[in-house]
Amino acid sequence: MAAAPFHDRDGWVWMDGEFVPQREAKVHVLTHAMHYASCVFEGERAYDGTIFKSRDHSERLHKSAKILGFGIPYAAEEIDRAKHELINKMGFGDAYVRAL
């Protein structure tokens, strides 16, 4: 049996500075990222509830965004805090986290 599609799963995402149920997280079809594949992201591993080199990832996310001329409205500290809270909220120990 196939796993449930990502849009139809229980869970949470951190979006626009707040936690949103995964099923309610929506991105507008006319967003720049959809039309031009303009996005930056970091793929991060968490072990025992701790993201490996979380701050390095958050700072690199900011640097990547700057290269493409994007502004990120959240400081690296806020992004780190949100990632940590999300892992706890989801009850994950070992996980893959993608900040974008």
Residue map of PLM features:
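Conserved alpha/beta cores of soluble small-molecule-handling proteins
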Residues: 1-100
